[in-house]
């Protein structure tokens, strides 16, 4: 049976880094809401046309549409899926739970990346990425070996997100805690919440995630 996990954590907690490792090491597929919407929009399918119409009107895509896209992805099979950025609310969590039951699947583990807010702001405000290959760097903890040049691909296209500044980060954290924090209690009650230390070294976080994954029944 496919393994389905949810990654929870505030912006910059390291969800993307750990998702990439799970993709590479365990063959899971990452289901990112943004990626699914962009893919659907360009697909030309009936669902894709609905997505395009909503986005072209500048409106938010409904939970019903997102669940429809997830249903399509789950129907394609595979070793399993990583839910990143969904669910964000209790209503979405309930809808996902119902979809899983309908498709005779389950959420095997919810991995919560726990972080200290002040440390998180420090971490993200120094972050930049390679626009070519996506490698992530940090001014203090992971600078490039050669200033202005990516260690991996050699590109000089190094970028900082416009909202990776202290004020914007505090706003994003407040939004996360207001909307998404209730999910922690939701999945705790269901018995599949697994906290990990999101501020540990990347390899240590990966080791904690691996322990969670290895406990999932085959």
Swiss-Prot record:
One Gene Ontology molecular-function label: zinc ion binding
Keywords carried by this UniProt record: ATP-binding, Cytoplasm, Kinase, Metal-binding, Nucleotide biosynthesis, Nucleotide-binding, Transferase, Zinc
GO cellular component annotations of the record: cytoplasm
Subcellular location, record wording: Cytoplasm
Region (NMP): 32-61
PROSITE patterns xrefs: ADENYLATE_KINASE
EC supergroup of this enzyme: transferase
Residue sites binding AMP per the record: 33, 38, 59-61, 85-88, 92, 161, 172
Biological-process GO terms, alphabetical: AMP salvage
Annotated Pfam families: ADK (PF00406), ADK_lid (PF05191)
Stretch list, region LID: 126-164
Binding positions (Zn(2+)): 130, 133, 150, 153
Family named by the database record: Belongs to the adenylate kinase family.
Record function comment: Catalyzes the reversible transfer of the terminal phosphate group between ATP and AMP. Plays an important role in cellular energy homeostasis and in adenine nucleotide metabolism.
Quaternary structure note: Monomer.
Protein name in UniProt: Adenylate kinase
UniProt source species: Paracoccus denitrificans
């Amino acid at each position: 049976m496919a393994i389905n996990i949810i990654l929870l954590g505030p912006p910059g907690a390291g969800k993307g880094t750990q998702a990439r490792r799970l993709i590479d090491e365990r063959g899971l597929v990452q289901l990112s809401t943004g990626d699914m919407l962009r893919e659907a929009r360009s697909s030309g399918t009936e669902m894709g046309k609905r997505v395009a119409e909503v986005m072209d009107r500048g409106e938010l895509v409904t939970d019903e549409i997102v669940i429809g896209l997830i249903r399509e992805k789950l129907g394609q099979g595979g070793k399993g899926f990583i839910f990143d950025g969904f669910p964000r609310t209790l209503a979405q969590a309930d809808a996902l739970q119902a979809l899983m039951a309908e498709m005779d699947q389950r959420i095997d583990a919810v991995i919560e990346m726990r972080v200290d807010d002040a440390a998180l702001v420090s971490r993200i405000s120094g972050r930049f990425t390679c626009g070519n290959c996506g490698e992530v760097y940090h001014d203090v903890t992971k600078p490039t070996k050669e200033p202005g040049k990516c260690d991996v691909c050699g590109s000089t296209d190094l970028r900082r997100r416009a909202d990776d500044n202290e004020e914007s980060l505090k706003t994003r954290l407040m939004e996360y805690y207001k909307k998404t924090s209730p999910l922690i209690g939701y999945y705790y009650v269901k018995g599949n919440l697994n906290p990990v230390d999101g501020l540990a070294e990347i390899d240590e976080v990966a080791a904690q995630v691996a322990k969670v994954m290895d406990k999932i029944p085959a």
